[in-house]
Amino acid sequence: MTATPYPILLTPGPLTTSDRTRAAMLRDWGSWDTDFNAITARIRQQVLAIVHGDDTHECVPLQGSGTFSVEAAIGTLVPRDGHVLVPVNGAYCQRIAKICKTLGRRLSTIDYAEDRPMRAADIDRQLAADSTITHVAVVHCETGTGVLNPLDEIAQVVARHGRGLIVDAMSSFGAIDIDARTTPFDAVIAASGKCLEGVPGMGFVIARRTALERCEGNSHSLSLDLYDQWKYMERTTQWRFTPPTHVVAALDQALQQYVEEGGLPARGARYASNCQLLVDGMETLGLKPYLERKVQAPIIVTFHAPADPRYDFKTFYQAVKQRGYILYPGKLTEIETFRVGCIGHFGDAGIPGAVKAIGEVLAGMGVEIGMTVAA
């Protein structure tokens, strides 16, 4: 069992937060008050600093889940007659493609197996062959499996062709380096409840200022219009519509702790250590990771489910939960898996404790350890 009265979330967000972050939500804020506006301004500056984008980019926060911000970025930055190339190697890439279709943006895709990263050379060939493509939209860390895509290589290719790059960095931002000075992008999109260890409820788009300035009138939506949101914030320091005040206050506190910890290098190192402990521990149980280690992001790890017919995910999940850990089901199309997150605010005993609980549960179910689905 865990030492806390509530389960540890071993998920890619929402995730386990610190007492300080939760305590920040105990105060109520006026959404038009100058003190709250100062919090918003501070968050915008701190988020920009993480990517070294102060001189070239703008941080535009938005209410809602991260997907709201992804849709806002595509709907605002891609003109209505634009053409988006989406490399697809997982569920969240597929979501971007669905957004493009829903918004009526022309779409092309490059399809990969779910256990393989995107290849910059494929994108290079596609851009060379089709001059109508205006933007490329990629997922940095595909949360469906945990595969890490080669963002910098892709960014250099897209820039060389003079196209815009939109990056869904939901599961990587704040833990895996993205540097606006060396990795060209029009937008990087992330959210409060992931690697920054805030709570869910707001996202943000880090948009290249020169790209954003050209976007007036592009958006299909009033509430998801990033250009209007940005201009209004610049003019008034306020959100256009009622902000999630408690979520904003929690993110402000989470960012303070992020800096205290040592910023991106320290956060990334902690998650990498968690990932290593997790994979090593699960392999001792005979549970095989779905991905090769060289393409595994230290955010969430997908494991093959046991092939033993006595294994049932719902029973397994509930029993692990009773021991204090909440896992994630798989999000693959062909193979039965389950996922374990490496991110969140939990102590050094968190991952070893989870591995121990998983081993006990499988043994209690009579599942033959090591009898897993073949790759």
From Swiss-Prot:
One of its GO terms (molecular function) is 2-aminoethylphosphonate-pyruvate transaminase activity. Its cofactor is pyridoxal 5'-phosphate. The keyword Nucleotide-binding does not apply. GO terms for biological process: organic phosphonate catabolic process. It catalyses: (2-aminoethyl)phosphonate + pyruvate = phosphonoacetaldehyde + L-alanine. The modification N6-(pyridoxal phosphate)lysine is found at residue 194. It comes from the Bacteria. Involved in phosphonate degradation. This is 2-aminoethylphosphonate--pyruvate transaminase 2. It comes from Cupriavidus pinatubonensis (strain JMP 134 / LMG 1197).
